[in-house]
From Swiss-Prot:
This is Protein ApaG. NCBIfam families: PRK05461.1. One of its GO terms (biological process) is error-free translesion synthesis. It comes from the Bacteria. Signal peptide: none annotated. InterPro entries: ApaG_domain, ApaG_sf, Uncharacterised_ApaG. PANTHER family: F-BOX ONLY PROTEIN 3, POLYMERASE DELTA-INTERACTING PROTEIN 2. HAMAP family: ApaG. Residues 2-126 form the ApaG domain.
Amino acid sequence: MSALDNSIRVEVKTEYIEQQSSPEDEKYLFSYTITIINLGEQAAKLETRHWIITDANGKTSEVQGAGVVGETPTIPPNTAYQYTSGTVLDTPFGIMYGTYGMVSESGEHFNAIIKPFRLATPGLLH
């Protein structure tokens, strides 16, 4: 664990995209807007992403790759980077979590933790 691991805060907002979902075909589309906030003293570049996505049936998929939405943004200190992406589940509920592989201005590699967040159709959870 690096001292820089806590220098990045990740906030998530999710939305169920009803008009592009097809529950009768077990296809539920969710968008998620991620805000990555650099609380550290150095710029940090997002190099990789690693997601674990689990639906209500326990089916898990893993997504790994370079950057996010085709970008590898450098986030200066005390600023934020935001993007929106999406995923399709076979169930009306699921959970996502993961990490961003980051590198600091000084060349130190560290992980920014993405805490588990829910993907759920409206009215499903009280």
